[in-house]
Amino acid sequence: MAYSWDNRVMYIIRYFYDIDNNGLLDKNDFECLAVRNTIVESRGTFPEDVFATNKKVMADLWNELAELADFNKDGEVSADEFKQAVKTHCQGKSYANFPTAFRTFIDKQFRTVDVNADGFVGVEEYRLDCISRAGFSDVGEIDDAYNKLCNDADKKAGGINLARYQELYAQFLSNPDEKCSACYLFGPLKVIE
């Protein structure tokens, strides 16, 4: 159940987009994302130029997401609307065929997770990313998920590069198989109620 397609999409909503935790996606969530991404990308500082870029990216992201998913045009995207948009625009598709808003967010997410900016998400960065969303009493649980996620090429390279991250993220959203390795992209998942 934790790795079902439905739960994976709910996970994305709760932990990546619904920043104000009100159960709906709206413009405020993306304004908050601009602030958060600026601070995370800048390692605690708040450069105005980086914020201006992030603010524009997140405003564009919200506008495109609202166009794709706000079916009733109320200025909010419900979980059901988001799921329907993902089914329509992402399911069964590769990263290259995702809407621009989704591709932009995926690329920004990679830069956020790649803490040391070496172009790879290694196990240490993966651990940091996982614990930022959920509690774990055993680091082995996280490491096991990372090992299930990585293929031989990832392990040989010392981590997951941007192209592979894009591929995995696309599979996380588009592949209904609960056993695909991409299910572990964000660590051991919890069931979202």
Question: Can you annotate each of these PLM segments?
Answer:
Residues 61-193:
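EF-hand and EF-hand-like Ca2+-sensor regions
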